[in-house]
Regions:
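Bergerat-fold GHKL ATPase/HATPase_c domain
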Residues: 1-63, 90-97
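Conserved structured core elements
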Residues: 6-9, 38-47, 74, 86-93, ...
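Short hinge/gating elements
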Residues: 26-36, 78, 107-110, 155, ...
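Conserved phosphate-chemistry cores used by DNA topoisomerases
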Residues: 31-32, 36-42, 46-50, 67, ...
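Conserved catalytic-core segments centered on acid/base and nucleophilic motifs
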Residues: 45, 52-56, 77-85, 110-124, ...
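Conserved beta-strand-loop-beta-strand hairpin that lines the nucleotide-binding pocket
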Residues: 53-107, 147-149
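GHKL-type ATPase core
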Residues: 107-216
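GHKL/Histidine-kinase-like ATPase module
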Residues: 152-156, 179-291
Length: 292
């Protein structure tokens, strides 16, 4: 997703010395990044799912579902496997050891842009596994919280494979959280253009959607399909804070209807955690345009 340009208004009259600020690379910094999510389980499913969908878009497989295996008593791991472009060794190291770096900031055809979503499993687990399938070679890695609290990438080796290109992310889940992962998967993936194939929980099911009324870019559904108004941008559903709109405005009246609004990638500003919208003029105008 292309970042929206911002103009910094700075007065420099009388400046005699200027020094750039920096960020210290230590456990505190990485812990703050990992703990920015109010709902870590939902964030993990959302970010890894968005990355899987982006990989399918790059591979021209946007109509092919990726796979999600939910944790259960037989296999307590969450496994998310895409069948997209795969990753070379150079790409793996570039993506997983660099925070704030993304190769998606020049396009609005893909969701990512902040360079932190691929590391979201560290918000829940102390390590997670990365298995890449690339042109007949399978390579296994793990991103772990090292003894000093700074994440490090470990590589375990490569083997020949006949598996399709793509990436699998996996990590162990506590038994008490099995149902939470299943519930959050419904919340997150019901909004995806191409929903993933979900296994591991026999009771998992997407809710049936029955639209009462709809327009080109919005719909209002019957029942509790959406408990509040959301804007879907790049497969990710963002709750809309109606208090950001004038009380007697037509937007405020419409947004009270628990609607689902769809906008193109880049039409709104979002927070780095991707849990909420950033209510800039750009975002307000984008929502108003979508429901006008």
């Amino acid at each position: 997703m292309k970042a929206v340009s911002r103009i910094n208004n700075v007065t420099r009259n009388g400046v005699q010395k200027s020094t750039k600020c920096g960020i210290v690379v230590n456990a505190k910094a990485f812990d703050m990044l990992a703990r920015q999510y109010s709902d870590p389980i939902k964030a993990i499913l959302q970010e890894l799912g968005a990355n899987a969908a982006d990989s399918h878009i790059r591979a021209g497989k946007q109509d092919v579902p990726f796979s999600v295996k939910l944790p259960n008593s037989l296999d307590p791991h969450l496994r998310i496997r895409d069948y997209g472009v795969g990753m070379t060794e150079d790409v793996v190291y570039d993506v997983y050891i660099n925070y704030m770096k993304s190769d998606k900031t020049d396009t609005n055809s893909e969701t990512g842009c902040f360079g932190i979503g691929s590391k979201t499993p560290l918000a829940y687990a102390d390590q997670f596994n990365i298995t890449t399938y690339n042109d007949g070679t399978m390579t296994m890695y793990a991103l772990v919280k090292s003894e000093d609290g700074v994440p490090e990438l470990n590589e375990f080796g490569s083997w020949n494979t006949e598996e399709d290109n793509g990436v699998e992310i996996s990590f162990s889940v506590k038994e008490d959280d099995f149902d939470k992962f299943s519930d959050r998967a419904v919340q997150v993936y019901k909004y995806f253009n191409t929903r993933p194939e979900v296994t591991g929980n026999g009771s998992f099911a997407y809710p049936e959607r029955k639209d009462i009324i709809s327009g080109d870019t919005w719909r209002i559904s019957k029942g509790s399909y959406s408990d509040n108004t959301v804007v879907v941008m790049g497969n990710v559903a963002y709750p809309v804070d109606i208090w950001q709109f004038e009380y007697d405005s037509k937007e405020r009246g419409f947004l009270n209807n628990n609607a689902v609004i769809e906008v193109p990638i880049g039409d709104l500003n979002v927070t780095p955690s991707r849990e909420s919208l950033e209510y800039t003029d750009h975002t307000i105008k984008g929502i108003s345009k979508a429901i006008s």
